[in-house]
Structures are given as C-alpha cells and as structure tokens.
Curated annotation (Swiss-Prot):
Keyword Oxidoreductase belongs to the record: yes
EC number in record: 1.1.1.37
Name of the protein in question: Malate dehydrogenase
Pfam families: Ldh_1_C, Ldh_1_N
Organism (species): Saccharophagus degradans (strain 2-40 / ATCC 43961 / DSM 17024)
Record's keyword terms, sorted: NAD, Oxidoreductase, Tricarboxylic acid cycle
An individual GO BP term: tricarboxylic acid cycle
Length: 327
C-alpha cells in the first residue's frame, strides 16, 4: 500500500462536500490503492456540524481513510496538503451585486492562498470549486507566490459533463461515443461550449446537429444549466458538482484517456490569444500528474467571438478585485 496523501477540503460541512468527502475516502479520486488523510476546513460556527460529518466518515470504515483533521484554521487544514479542493465560498445573497460577491470571496481566497503558500506541499494540486471559481482561483494563486501558478485550477468539468449529456441525449448515443468536448472560458453564463472539435463515433459533432439547435438550444442550455437546477431543486447543484470535482482531480492525478481531452480552468500561457495569467478554461490533456493545453485547434469567427466575450468577463472580474490582489 502507498503512503497516505493529504487532501484538504474547505467548506467541508457543506452540501457539495457531503457528496464529495465519502467518495474521496472510498478511493474514487486518487485510486483504490491510495490511502488519504482528509484535512477538513470550516468556519467556526460550522465545526459542530463538521464533527458530525467526521463521525459518519468514521462509521463508513473506509480502508483507505488513514486519518482526519477538522479545523477552522487554514494553516492547520493546508499543512503539508498534497491536494486541495476549495469548495467553501460566500454564496450570493439577496440584493448582492456581483462586485460585492467578488470582494467577499477575495477576502476568503486571499487567506487560503497565503496558507497554501506557507504550509502546503510544494507539489500541491489545487482545484477551486467555490464560485466565482475562475477568479477565486486567480486570487488564491496570486497570494501563493512560492507555488507554481500551474498548480491552481478552476472547475469546468461540470460544464463539460453537462455538454456531454446534452449531446448524447440529442443524438441518442452513449457517453462513450463522444470525445473531445470543449468548454472555453469562465464558469458562468458566458462560457462557450464548443462542438467544432467534438467527435461522435469519430465524426465531427457539429456536422451531426442543426445549426439552430447548436446555437440557440445547446449553448444556452449548458450555459444556464446551473440556474435551471436551482429553479427546479430550490438549491444549487451539489452531487453533480462533487462528481465533477472527483473527475477533474482523478484525471489530473492519474491521466486523461487516450485520444480524448477534458476542460479545465487553468493558468493561461497566452494560448489561442487568451491573455496570459487569467484562469481560463481550455481543452487539456493530463499525464504524469501534469496538464497541457491542447494546441493547434482551428478557431472560426463564431468561436473567436464567443471565446473573447468570456475572456472579457474574466478580465472584468479580475479588475473588480485588482485592489485586493498582491502587486
């Protein structure tokens, strides 16, 4: 059996984490031969609820769960962490402007970025789930100057999976028939679900669907799926978000399948003309615990306009919190 790795999870008593922690402890994220120590962070008023979650984790008797830490101190929760899933974030309250939300989260993710910088493993892999995920990831990354910026990512896998399931339903195929789904940009309603490179049974997806369905049904459905779930369920996506987090981390740690790629919010190196330093979703392949942006895809005018619109939103979000970012 391998030596245990340390997995930090924030917002650990929340809805998403309740669907996430048990699957990590069961080996779904890092493999059935990898023991884990869960290092769970919560705000002080939620520590009692977190204690209950820890009791349940104990009661599952997971062979791979090698230990647990419950804390309200980021310096404790991120100590020597090999992986971090930043799930906890300030939700948008009634009458709250987007700028207020960005600023409230900037305070949270600045503190967590500093704690990661000061206490985590130098090889830590960070996934930000809490929204606005891309900009929260940027804030954490900027507050961790001693950690390679490539080690901070934002979750786009839920959007990616939503695209897969919508396309499979439309064409009456299985998910195994579809490869190379791509989501570009921000985890928001400006994201661009791109079918020009997606293959269904080896043939280009966009040629198998009507233009009107693609532009006026598929794209807005994927973009607005989160809001549709809140309307139907009365609460935001939790189990599907946890599932996407597991898939994102599993593929990053263990590798993506041959001849396929995944969508990840990653540190832009200027690929496809996207401003360097933004956390932007690109098609990525993973191997040996690292990711690479897929290069050489042809981008037409329709795609370019969509990619630029979501890039501009990310620039606006960054500029809204610029005063809170380290120089």
């Amino acid at each position: 059996m391998k030596a245990p790795v340390r997995v930090a999870v924030t917002g650990a008593a929340g809805q998403i984490s309740y669907s996430l922690l048990f699957r990590i402890a069961a080996g779904e994220m890092l493999g059935k031969d990898q023991p884990v120590i869960l290092q769970m962070l919560e705000i002080t008023p939620a520590l009692e609820a977190l204690k209950g979650v820890a009791m349940e984790l104990d009661d599952c008797a997971f062979p791979l769960l090698a230990g647990m830490v419950c804390s309200d101190d980021p310096n404790v929760a991120f100590k020597d962490a090999d992986y971090a899933l930043l799930v906890g974030a300030r939700p948008r309250g009634p009458g709250m402007e987007r700028k207020d939300l960005l600023e409230a989260n900037a305070a949270i993710f600045s503190v967590q970025g500093k704690a990661i910088n000061d206490h985590a493993s130098r090889d830590i892999k960070v996934l930000v789930v809490g929204n606005p995920a891309n900009t929260n990831a940027l804030i954490a990354q900027r507050n961790a100057p001693d950690i390679n910026p490539r080690q901070f990512t934002a979750m786009m896998r839920l959007d990616h999976n939503r695209g897969l399931s919508q396309l499979a339903a439309k064409l009456d195929v299985t998910l195994e028939d579809i490869t190379k789904m791509t989501i570009w940009g921000n985890h928001s309603a400006t994201q661009y679900p791109d079918l020009f490179h997606t293959l269904v049974k080896g043939d280009v997806a966009v040629e198998q669907v009507e233009k009107d369905w693609y532009e006026n049904d598929f794209i807005p459905t994927v973009q607005q799926r989160g809001a549709a779930i809140i309307k139907a369920r009365g609460a935001s996506s939790a189990a599907s978000a946890a599932n996407a987090a597991i898939f994102h981390m599993r593929d990053w740690a263990l590798g993506t399948p041959e001849n396929d790629w995944v969508s990840m919010g990653v540190y832009s190196d200027g690929s496809y003309g996207i401003e360097e330093g933004l956390i932007y979703s690109f098609p990525c392949v993973c191997k040996n615990g690292d990711w690479e942006i897929v290069q050489g895809l042809t981008i037409d005018e329709f795609s370019r306009a969509k990619m630029t619109a979501t890039e501009n939103e990310l620039k606006e979000e960054r500029d809204a919190v610029k005063s809170l970012l380290p120089a």
